[in-house]
Structures are given as structure tokens and as C-alpha cells.
Amino acid sequence: VTTQQLLTPAEAAELSGFSLDTLRYYERIGLLTAITRATSGHRRFTPDDLAWLGILRCLRDTGMPIADMRRYAELARTEGPAGLLDRIALLEQHDTAVNDHIALLERQRTHLREKIDWYRSLLPAG
């Protein structure tokens, strides 16, 4: 990785959609590891770090709890078939939870639309 490919924390935050505080927190709890440091000691993010942040963004946006995100990060650092199988299982479990949440949201949206239609029916004609 060349220094031109390294991003400041502010750039990584902007591109990932995470705040600087969240990036620091993720590093502190082990979701981000081995962050490169400039000679000044400041953190620098690589393209691989940014790709990893994209995965974390997906997991967070779909409601994965931090504990499960930490487990996923641990498994991502585990080599071999066992680590892969565990990652697949964790992601499949999360996919099921996401599908359940989508189904709930669709039912709630239907309820909202019915309520909107009801209120519109109460308006005077014309």
C-alpha cells in the first residue's frame, strides 16, 4: 500500500459513513485491528480497512448486535474451513433475522397505509 492510498480517519469516516468516535470505538473493541500508523503516530486507513468498514456498515445497518459483530470479526481472523463455516452460520442466522425484520416492517407499513386511507376517507369530498 502506498502512502497515496492511505486515508486519514476523517476521510475513512466520510467514505464509510461512520463517525470518528465510532471508528475509535470499533478499534477499541477489536472490530478494527492493525490500523496503520503514520510516522507521526496518526492512524491511516488502507483500502482493505475501508472494505472491512463496508462490511461492518452492512452488519450494523441491518441490525446486527455489536457482540455478534465482534464474533464475526474474530471469525474473520480465523483461518481454515472451521472459521469459514462459523462465519457462514453467523451470517445465515443474521440473514434470517433480517428477513424476519423485513416481514415485520412490511406488515407495519400495510397498517400505516390503512390508517392513512382511513384518515383520507374522513376528509370532506371536494
Task: List where the protein language model places each region.
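Arg/Lys-rich, alpha-helical DNA-contact motif
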Residues: T2-P9, E14, T33, P47-G126
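Conserved active-site tyrosine of GNAT-family acetyltransferases
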Residues: Y26, F45
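N-terminal helix-turn-helix
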Residues: T22-R24, T36
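Short glycine/proline-centered loop/turn elements that form peptide/ligand docking sites
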Residues: A12, S19-T22
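Beta-hairpin "wing" of winged helix-turn-helix
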Residues: L32-S40, R44
